[in-house]
Amino acid sequence: MHTHIGIFAKHVSRPTPEELFEAVAGYGFNCVQFNAACLGIPSLPDAIDETLWRRAARAARSAGVKVVALSATFNLLDENKVRLADNFRRLELLAQGATVLGTDLVTLCSGTRYQQDMWTYHPGNQSPAAWRDMTDAMQRALNIATVHDVYLGIEPEVANVVSNAQDAARLIAELDSDRIRIIFDPANLYRPPADPRRDGYVITNALLLLGARVAIAHCKDVADPNQAAHHNHSGLYEHVAAGRGILDYGHYVSELKRLVPESVPLILHGLTEEQIPASVSFMHERINEIATLQRSQTSEDL
């Protein structure tokens, strides 16, 4: 059903690219979302050492691991215009690095008015001015993507300007570019009072809107807010490793199969290396359950 199951490469820390990709394969993964930090350099590097990047590409191929995306996230609403301009320069470098690694997908963050952390909510994110600033910056990123023949992976995230599936659909319509792809993470779409245990419509409606553009499906979980360790005064859910929370993964996997045209890579993240085996087992169990159910339904229809 899903032939590509992988992980954020940063969750597996090893001193060399060869050891990194061997470890990734050893956990049963056949793909990764890569980050330049895995090469011992900044996530937004100042330069591209092609020898180092080619070495990483060879190591991935040797281990049988496909690089399906390269992270290039920075705050598109950075109020420090000098730093923002420099980050666009670094984005262009990463577009080149992605090509060396054999992927055409570079992931971005749509940004926030909160200046200390690009993944933290700010009430100004919903303003028309924030939307204009974000689309202007996104167009600049699209121009870079066009030059280097890569695609931009945008993730709807409650803490950012593109905070839900409707925002993502609006962005695609307004910029009218085939180079926008969606990184789909249902854990990032739930905001109380919507409950991941019962409100599967959040996933279904989002995939009905965006399914044709989904390039990667992220897999983390929503922490049970009733547990003291995850009581959050921000009004948002906290996240845990896949299988340790309350997200209905059976519904998620079945809707991916139903509404996404091709089998997109499932990428685990938001976990420690020690949690990887349990989360991998959990994902395979859900995938096998859905496959068995679908075979049973097919037999009944014959």
Model-inferred region functions:
Residues 18-19, 59-62, 78-184:
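Active-site acidic/histidine proton-transfer and metal-coordination neighborhood
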Residues 1-104, 139, 177, 181, ...:
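N-terminal pre-domain/capping segments
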Residues 24, 32, 60, 98, ...:
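Conserved, mostly hydrophobic/aromatic
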Residues 8-12, 35-39, 72-75, 111-113, ...:
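Active-site beta-loop-alpha junctions enriched in small/polar residues
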Residues 24, 112-121, 225-235:
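Short, flexible, mixed-charge acidic loops at enzyme active sites
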Residues 234, 241, 250-252, 257-266:
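H/E-rich (His + Asp/Glu) clusters that bind or coordinate divalent metals
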